[in-house]
Amino acid sequence: MKTNHPETYDGRQDHIPSLKTPEIESFTNVYEGKDYTIDFTVPEFTAVCPKTGLPDFGVIYVSYVPTKRCIELKSFKEYILSYRNVGVFHEFLVNKIMEDLIAAIDPKYLKVIGDYNARGGIKTVVTREYNKI
């Protein structure tokens, strides 16, 4: 039994790392040097399945400990909305969000979770954590 299908999936996500999205803006952390956590949730995230073209729905959770900069939420909302019509696998999306947030604010700690609605009887949760060395 063949378990992978490179002819079906290879190359479908090559554009994701360089995908042009709105800038995630930031502001100065006036409590730099104090460790505190900022958590926020995107309860109505939508993108498109690159395989089927059907919409994917889920919740995106972000938790971070800032250093010098904090995420400006209106710009993050615009960033998240830019994925609405993008065909992206769950795993690629969580990693792309993680890398874009690291580039924007260089946090001490960051966790991104993509908790997707069940499709075809399968629920997907993708988690990535980052700790600054």
Curated annotation (Swiss-Prot):
Substrate binds at I71, E72, L73, H90, E91. Keywords: Cytoplasm, NADP, Oxidoreductase, Queuosine biosynthesis. Pathway: tRNA modification; tRNA-queuosine biosynthesis. It comes from Leptospira borgpetersenii serovar Hardjo-bovis (strain JB197). It catalyses: 7-aminomethyl-7-carbaguanine + 2 NADP(+) = 7-cyano-7-deazaguanine + 2 NADPH + 3 H(+). The gene is queF. Catalyzes the NADPH-dependent reduction of 7-cyano-7-deazaguanine (preQ0) to 7-aminomethyl-7-deazaguanine (preQ1). The keyword Transferase does not apply. The active site is at C49, D56. SUPFAM superfamilies: Tetrahydrobiopterin biosynthesis enzymes-like (SSF55620). It comes from the Bacteria. Gene3D superfamilies: 3.30.1130.10. One of its GO terms (molecular function) is preQ1 synthase activity. The keyword 4Fe-4S does not apply. Its EC number is 1.7.1.13. GO terms for cellular component: cytoplasm. It is found in: Cytoplasm. This is NADPH-dependent 7-cyano-7-deazaguanine reductase. GO terms for biological process: queuosine biosynthetic process; tRNA modification. Belongs to the GTP cyclohydrolase I family. QueF type 1 subfamily. Pfam families: QueF (PF14489).
